[in-house]
């Protein structure tokens, strides 16, 4: 395990607090904005001893190796991105350790996203469990290495459900490292929000919805689920995330 340069564990955490429903001193940054550094975001995280997902502890304190990060695939024309997006991809290292909520806050800060959107989407995808498995298949050709059990495997892993077939260079960090998993997924969202997910250009949305453009965070949230722009799958997914966002379900009793 590498030592994190932005590890909040050494800081004194206050007890559980309702401030986890607030955006703190960071939130949505428009396309083209200068994004905060990892260190700046570590300093902005609202620390708390609150940890509703103690099962995440090992993954929350694991950081990818330099070799693993070097194996990530570039974001360019061949992968459906404007080449400018690769500058975002190169910032992804999963270099943070903390509680599950602290990791989600840090991720939101780093990519200039409302933290409650990140929290709500993590509820939708995994109920905040980094161990979440999804998309069971009997097609061995789409299984991550080492996951085929002779009958089937799961394709999607982690707190925000990264699907192996579309993100091969991010395996096994997408399964094993919470900060990497969250940071990578929202790096994808940020590239979309900047207008740099080039394969979406020209894809027709459902009637009444706008075409792909920079600055539409909810369209980009839907794109994560369906791979398209305001198709019916994306629209339904957005509604689910928005409901968790409005209800702040991570603060409900029993979460």
Question: Over which residues does each language-model region extend?
Answer:
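Asp/Glu-centered strand-loop micro-motifs enriched in Gly/Pro and often flanked by an aromatic residue
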Residues: 87-96, 104-108
């Amino acid at each position: 395990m590498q030592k994190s340069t932005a590890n909040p564990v050494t800081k004194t955490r206050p007890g559980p607090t309702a401030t986890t429903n607030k955006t703190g001193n960071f939130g949505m940054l428009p396309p083209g904005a200068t994004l905060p550094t990892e260190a700046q975001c570590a300093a902005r995280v609202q620390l708390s001893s609150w940890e509703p997902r103690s099962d995440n502890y090992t993954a929350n304190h694991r950081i990818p190796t330099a070799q693993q990060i070097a194996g990530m695939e570039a974001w360019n024309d061949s992968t459906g991105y404007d080449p400018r997006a690769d500058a975002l991809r190169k910032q992804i290292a999963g270099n943070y350790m903390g509680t599950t909520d602290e990791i989600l806050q840090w991720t939101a800060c780093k990519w200039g996203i409302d933290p409650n959107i990140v929290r709500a989407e993590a509820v939708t995808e995994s109920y905040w469990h980094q161990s979440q498995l999804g998309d069971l298949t009997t097609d061995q050709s789409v299984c991550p290495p080492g996951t085929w059990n002779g009958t089937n495997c799961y394709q999607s892993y982690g707190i925000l459900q990264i699907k192996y077939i579309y993100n091969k260079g991010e395996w096994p960090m997408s399964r094993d490292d919470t900060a990497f998993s969250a940071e990578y997924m929202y790096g994808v969202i940020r590239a979309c929000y900047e207008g740099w997910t080039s394969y979406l250009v020209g894809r027709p949305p459902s009637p009444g919805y706008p075409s792909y453009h920079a600055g539409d965070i909810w369209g980009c949230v839907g794109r994560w689920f369906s791979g398209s722009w305001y198709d019916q799958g994306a629209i339904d997914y957005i509604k689910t995330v928005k409901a968790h966002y409005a209800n702040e379900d991570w603060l409900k009793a029993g979460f």
